[in-house]
Amino acid sequence: MNNNSRNECLRILALLVLFFSSLFIQPVIGGQITSPKKPNQVLFDFRLNQTSNPSRIPLSTQRRVLGRVFRRYLSDESKCNPQLETGSVSDPLKGARDAGQIVPSILDVATGSFTATGRTETLYLISVSECNASHADNFGTKRVAIFAGEQLIANVDVDFKSAIVRKTDLNGDGVDELLMTAGDIHQGILTEVAALIEFRGARLHVIEDFGVVTEDSCASEMPGSSAKASVVSMSEVMPPTMPKLRIQNYEAGCRKTKRWRFISNGKMQ
């Protein structure tokens, strides 16, 4: 091998060593070694079809739970008093609850530590179904009841949230959060809102209100109908700090196979 060929081989070898070394050497910023930035993790993608799979709750459990949460309630809608007068009170739904004119049912159940670290608890999502509740009232209020064994720890209104879509512990403090949604259909337009909620200390705390996360007007068949949906992602989880949450919004036509395109960041307008 002549000198020119040997020099060319050495040059190529040096370039290869430099290339592979760069794959393993961490960047240094301000005298400190930094790790490559990790991509955001998806907390929930509302573009995906959601299948409701609520847990089956034995009738005996339902009766026990509802009996602890409500002093009086009805077992059937047919027993509602059609002459119930709540027009004189500022909150007709509260008037119905106070009168025992409710037909409650358990929508879902979850287990975890919801009010305090290390406590084993069962959370029940309840549809109160006040007898006078209309479509405008989302057919009644929704509540969460949390039990530790037989002890009722919390009984709080959840602002019409009717579904649990994910249980998390984002800051690793041992207290679980819930991503909850509420939906409504009006004139063929489906609207869904979401919030990340916790019940620390037996009180409701809204960690993040995401606002509208789904707006689908396809069923209305109006000109220009479309489907809009949000993707909620989070920065790297570094306990005990709550990760930063980010909303990205997408839109698609009304075809069966959706082709989503990015439209905005932040809460959907």
What are these regions (language model features)?
Residues 90-109, 156-165, 213-228:
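Repeat-based blade/solenoid architectures
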Residues 113-127, 169-184, 233-247:
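Acidic/hydrophobic-patterned starts of short beta strands in beta-sheet-rich repeat architectures
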Residues 150-158, 202-209:
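Blade-edge beta-strand/turn elements of extracellular beta-propeller
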Residues 18-19, 25-93, 186-269:
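Acidic, small-residue rich beta-repeat scaffolds with periodic aromatic anchors
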Residues 139-149, 194-202:
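Beta-propeller blade signature
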